[in-house]
């Protein structure tokens, strides 16, 4: 690794020259802008209309930049491994991680050989953003002064984490930074990580009141990660839903005939290989079969910001035919192999938005690049479907693929990909409903679900979760669904995780001698929990007690659960002692009394939604305005998810993830939908649409979606061309 300091004039000379009015490129932008109409509805949501798909993409990117250019740019700064250029040395190894997989030279070559139609869209993508910067000279990009079409390939799939983020920057620092820092381990009393994921439901016409397919879209993401948009062209594009900032396709959404919803999958879509490395002179080789192959060594440069100006670090990185080396384990170098098909991924991401039937949607799934996600589908023909993951390598089942495998053994090579038919898949199950909550597919449609014994172990690495249990409860016992009753099911307040936990706590209390001071201390709390219906509400004191008790117990025994390789939930219910359970309740009660004056504090007084600024990392303040939220963390089985905690300087808990864009859709001769987003459309605190959806968000009161142009009548705030 080498370090260099770049003189300021080098940095300035590398920056792109801003466009001028005399630039013929500007004339082209102006001409395209005249072919685009943006209609902002009374929630500030942009409905973009254009003759060609490319015109709509141009307008979409302009509208996104208007709403939150910072988030648009930041997503691509991160995707290209350039965070350290604005955030400094702390981001060096995050950037190195991205640069291991995202190489500008390679991306430019892939762009050059992309299909003409896709290149046209990528050009429109860059033009829309650059036109915004031209029209808004007061906006200073942090890093990307001019967007280039090839850059769209660096962020070609819409999920939050993706496969690359499975690589630990800490491990990269230990290996390439030559620092003996060890792997990060959770602290003994660390707060359990907030569950990620999403919910998707599809209800067949046979199980709905109007005999039309119903669809529930409920991604659980960090707040403000996606914007709500509509894209309409004269080339068959008419799509509505959530677009990840900076991308030109709707990721979770629907068109006039079909809808799709992605949930993070438990399928094993990547592998790590233990490479046996042999050094000969200054070169590295690795064993493969009976031979030794030369390891590829290349230089990656990571520029980073310092108080004195820009500097850079150069790393010599290594690769085998499996992929880049990401860490070392017991003397073996670990290579990672994952999907790297940006052109196909962008093709699939866009093409599915125009798929209006199951057959057409199924065809997009055959590109196999939606690697880390399951998909729920419904359409106006009455079809409902579940697709399990979309990139599952075929492997030799003799190996344990949950761990790194021997890279020197040719038998560990992938043998192609599993087809849709070879993967867990459902089409119109007899149950009349299907769902996924990031759990296994083997309960996706009740008795109609795929059978676990029909598939290799690597096809699904997870299991059931509390949301899955809850989903079956609300879907299997209800007939004649309507949009209203499906919303009610999705916001059902039951917390099934406490079905085992609360009885175990009460049993601990009942088995403790009456003379115990600990029993006396928690007697009133136990009486409340004994009569609790295990439903959340903003007025519920038992919800407060149960959540704080559960979190305290998790903190107390989390390390023990990990050491025994058990899930924390299983450990809580089966391995904790009566004293641990009661002690955790006493500790939680003391914490509540210290922070809020009494343990008898209603849940809504603690669990709050707040949006004070447009910062990507939000600040929170108990002195600022906020709203009560009834629904809890998904950890406890709440289908409506709200991941909240206290922050430095706060006692109240503020949410940063969970329900984000939420929608219910009814398909038929026409499409009807309702939706709500966390906060509002705009990232500007001065905008009336910064927080105008917050009350509806916290109460589950979805608003009407204006899908058809005539529905915008009397609901239009502004109609304009980009640049006006």
Where on the chain are the PLM-derived regions?
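Bacterial N-terminal signal peptides
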Residues: 5-15
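Hydrophobic alpha-helical segments
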Residues: 241, 370-478, 553
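Acidic, low-complexity N-terminal propeptides/linkers enriched in Ser/Thr/Asp/Gly that mediate export
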Residues: 118-216, 221-222, 368, 380-384, ...
């Amino acid at each position: 690794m080498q370090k260099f300091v770049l003189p300021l004039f080098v940095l300035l000379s590398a920056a792109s020259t801003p466009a001028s009015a005399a630039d013929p490129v500007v004339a082209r932008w102006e001409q395209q802008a005249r072919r685009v109409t943006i209609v902002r509805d009374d929630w500030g949501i942009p409905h973009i209309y254009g003759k060609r798909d490319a015109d709509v993409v141009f307008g979409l990117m302009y509208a996104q930049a208007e709403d939150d250019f910072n988030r648009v740019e930041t997503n691509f700064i991160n995707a290209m491994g350039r965070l350290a250029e604005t955030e400094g040395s702390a981001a060096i190894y995050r950037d190195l991680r991205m640069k291991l997989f995202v190489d500008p030279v390679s991306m430019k070559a892939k762009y050059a050989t992309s299909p003409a139609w896709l290149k046209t869209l990528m050009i429109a993508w860059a033009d829309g953003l650059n036109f915004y910067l031209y029209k808004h000279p007061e906006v200073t990009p942090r890093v990307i002064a001019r967007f280039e079409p090839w850059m769209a390939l660096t962020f070609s799939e819409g999920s939050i984490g993706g496969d690359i983020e499975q690589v630990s920057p800490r491990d990269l620092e230990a290996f390439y930074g030559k620092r003996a820092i060890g792997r990060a381990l959770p602290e003994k009393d660390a707060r359990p990580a907030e569950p990620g994921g999403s919910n998707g439901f599809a209800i067949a016409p046979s199980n709905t009141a109007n005999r039309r397919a119903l669809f529930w879209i409920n991604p659980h993401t960090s707040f403000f990660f996606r914007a709500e948009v509509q894209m309409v062209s004269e080339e068959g594009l008419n799509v509505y839903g959530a677009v990840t900032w900076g991308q030109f396709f709707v990721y979770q959404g629907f068109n006039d005939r079909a809808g799709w919803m992605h949930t993070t999958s438990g399928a094993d879509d990547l592998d790590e290989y233990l490479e046996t490395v042999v050094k000969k002179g200054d070169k590295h080789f690795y064993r493969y079969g009976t031979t030794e192959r030369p390891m590829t060594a290349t230089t990656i440069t990571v520029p980073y910001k310092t108080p004195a100006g820009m500097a850079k670090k150069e790393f010599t990185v290594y690769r085998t035919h499996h992929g880049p080396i990401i860490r070392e384990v017991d003397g073996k170098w670990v290579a990672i192999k994952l999907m790297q098909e940006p052109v196909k991924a962008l093709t699939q991401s866009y093409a599915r938005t125009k798929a209006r039937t199951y057959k057409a949607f199924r065809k997009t799934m055959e590109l196999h690049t939606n690697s880390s996600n399951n998909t729920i589908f419904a359409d106006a023909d009455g079809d409902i479907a579940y697709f399990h993951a979309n990139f599952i390598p075929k492997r030799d089942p003799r190996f344990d693929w949950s761990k790194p495998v021997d890279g020197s053994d040719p038998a560990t090579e992938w043998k192609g990909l599993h087809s849709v038919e070879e993967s867990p898949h459902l089409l119109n199950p007899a149950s009349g409903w299907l769902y996924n909550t990031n759990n296994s597919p083997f309960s996706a449609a009740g008795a109609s679900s795929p059978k676990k014994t029909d598939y290799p172990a690597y096809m699904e690495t997870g299991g059931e979760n509390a949301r899955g249990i809850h989903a079956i409860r609300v879907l299997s016992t209800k007939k004649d669904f309507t949009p209203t009753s499906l919303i009610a099911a999705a916001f059902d307040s039951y917390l099934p995780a406490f079905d085992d936990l609360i009885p175990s706590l009460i049993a601990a209390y009942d088995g403790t001698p009456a003379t115990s001071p600990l029993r006396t201390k928690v007697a009133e709390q136990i009486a409340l929990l004994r009569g609790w219906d295990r439903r959340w509400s903003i007025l519920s004191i038992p919800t407060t007690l149960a959540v704080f008790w559960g979190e305290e117990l998790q903190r107390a025994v989390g390390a023990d659960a990990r050491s025994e390789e058990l899930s924390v939930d299983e450990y809580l219910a089966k391995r904790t002692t009566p004293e641990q359970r009661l002690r955790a309740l006493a500790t939680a009660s003391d914490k509540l009394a210290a922070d809020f004056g009494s343990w008898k504090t209603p849940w809504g007084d603690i669990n709050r939604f707040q949006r004070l600024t447009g910062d990507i990392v939000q600040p929170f303040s108990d002195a600022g305005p906020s709203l009560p939220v009834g629904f809890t963390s998904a950890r406890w089985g709440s289908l409506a998810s709200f991941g909240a905690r206290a922050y430095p300087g706060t006692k109240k808990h503020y949410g940063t993830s969970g329900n984000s864009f939420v929608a219910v859709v009814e398909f038929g001769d026409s499409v009807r939908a309702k939706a709500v987003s966390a906060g509002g459309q705009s990232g500007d605190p001065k905008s009336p649409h910064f927080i105008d959806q917050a009350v509806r968000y916290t109460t589950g009161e979805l608003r009407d979606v204006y899908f058809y142009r005539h529905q915008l009548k009397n609901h239009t705030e502004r109609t304009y061309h980009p640049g006006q």
